């Protein structure tokens, strides 16, 4: 039973790690895009400078929004995948459902931690 718990836990950790790297990559890309747009803005000067700054900020905001959507989607897929894997081992009789459920205290701590991460933006 512990083998399955540990295996599912490792799977979750792997997905979370991948999500964080994806989010970090999108954020870095947004910063570089902003830098490029700002560079063009400083070279063109004049009235276009303000427009370029606005475009750079909007580009960064949109990239961050996409990043958040990707993170949310991947988390949903990961959760469903692990849930289905748990269902399979329970349905086939390899493990009892009670053996897979974490103790109530652990579950409450996990939910509280997830709530805090959501408030802080996952940082």
Swiss-Prot record:
Residues 107-123 have a biased composition (Basic and acidic residues). It is found in: Cytoplasm, Perinuclear region; Cytoplasm, Cytoskeleton, Microtubule organizing center, Centrosome; Cytoplasm, Cytoskeleton, Spindle. Keywords: Cytoplasm, Cytoskeleton, Phosphoprotein, Repeat. Its main location: cytoplasm. Residues 20-67 are annotated as: 4 X 11 AA tandem repeats of [EGSA]-K-T-K-[EQ]-[GQ]-V-X(4). GO terms for cellular component: axon; axon terminus; centrosome; cytoplasm; neuronal cell body; perinuclear region of cytoplasm; spindle. SUPFAM superfamilies: Synuclein. The keyword Transmembrane helix does not apply. One of its GO terms (biological process) is protein secretion. The modification Phosphoserine is found at residues 67, 72, 120. The keyword Cytoplasm applies. Specifically expressed in the peripheral nervous system. High expression in motoneurons of the brainstem. Also found in neurons of many other brain regions including the cerebellar cortex, thalamus, hypothalamus and CA1, CA2, CA3 and CA4 regions of the hippocampus. Residues 93-123 are annotated as: Disordered. Sequence repeats lie at residues 20-30, 31-41, 42-56, 57-67. Phosphorylated. Phosphorylation by GRK5 appears to occur on residues distinct from the residue phosphorylated by other kinases. GO terms for molecular function: alpha-tubulin binding; beta-tubulin binding; cuprous ion binding. Plays a role in neurofilament network integrity. May be involved in modulating axonal architecture during development and in the adult. In vitro, increases the susceptibility of neurofilament-H to calcium-dependent proteases. May also function in modulating the keratin network in skin. Activates the MAPK and Elk-1 signal transduction pathway. May be a centrosome-associated protein. Interacts with MYOC; affects its secretion and its aggregation. Belongs to the synuclein family. This is Gamma-synuclein. The lineage of its organism: Eukaryota, Metazoa, Chordata, Craniata, Vertebrata.
């Amino acid at each position: 039973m512990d083998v399955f718990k540990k295996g599912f836990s490792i799977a979750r950790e792997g997905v979370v790690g991948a999500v964080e790297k994806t989010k970090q990559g999108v954020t870095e890309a947004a910063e570089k895009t902003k830098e490029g747009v700002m560079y063009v803005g400083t070279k063109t000067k004049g009235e276009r400078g303000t427009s370029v700054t606005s475009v750079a900020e909007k580009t960064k905001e949109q990239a961050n929004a996409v990043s958040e959507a990707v993170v949310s989607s991947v988390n949903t897929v990961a959760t469903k995948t692990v849930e289905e894997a748990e269902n399979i081992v329970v349905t086939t009789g390899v493990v009892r459902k009670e053996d897979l459920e974490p103790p109530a205290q652990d579950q409450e701590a996990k939910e509280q931690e997830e709530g805090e991460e959501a408030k802080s933006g996952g940082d």
